């Protein structure tokens, strides 16, 4: 059986390795648009601040090492652009195409960039990959002030680590509290006070309207005023990387692929795991988008067991 996995970070590498382990006769191939696979996404902010000193420490396995350990073939810098469900094939940006018996979509998600002026200026960053973290870390070496837009987990972790590098850091968020939708107001207030004790400034109820400056970012304009900064990090959440299958006929909600308890989609032999898929909240029993590394690993394991006939 030939199993094609699109995406090679948490979910993709997890499901591929387990599928190969369960049946060595399976032909399992990972195709990823990235240069690297299996990197520690949760460690990216701490590489920015220097708590993780070396870039190499973020990479769990190189493609070569991963292939040697698992028997899974890895094809890097291969971006999928379309899927033909009738002929069971995937086409890539470089013009190549491959056939599959089973297709696993594990393409993850990308940072949201708001539709405001200035988001493409030099000195404006998002954080999702090792390269992103390296760029932020390098740029921060030559500036004094940073503005982080977004007060959820990633935004606050980036702020903490930029502060650790000696920068003057301001976090802005349009919500009335930090960690909106994650902490209740009382707990959020306590966390806010603890963060402010480190010298990080927090401005709430501030909706981003523009990135200010010339060619380089010089701060942000919000509905409550402007804030100066030599660099801006946008931490406004992520969106699923599913545009390339938007016309495939997959059931989706807000760009995320709907799957059942075994990670099957509504199309035969097509599955989805990780940040590009919805999962079922086992408490509420409702569909939920959970772009977390832990969720990616769990869904990858569930799918591998289902395909292997364990569950």
Roles of regions detected by a PLM:
Residues 107-165:
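Glycine-rich dinucleotide-binding loop and its adjacent helix/turn
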Residues 120-143, 215-305:
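FAD-site-proximal beta/loop scaffold in flavoenzymes
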Residues 1-72, 153, 161-183:
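Beta1-alpha1 glycine-rich phosphate/pyrophosphate-binding loop at the start
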Residues 25-29, 69, 74-92, 98, ...:
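A Rossmann-like FAD-binding core segment of flavoenzymes
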Residues 38, 100, 113-114, 156-157, ...:
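Glycine/Thr-rich phosphate-binding loops of Rossmann-like dinucleotide-binding domains
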Residues 92, 105-106, 148, 222, ...:
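Redox-cofactor binding/interface segments in oxidoreductases and associated redox assembly factors
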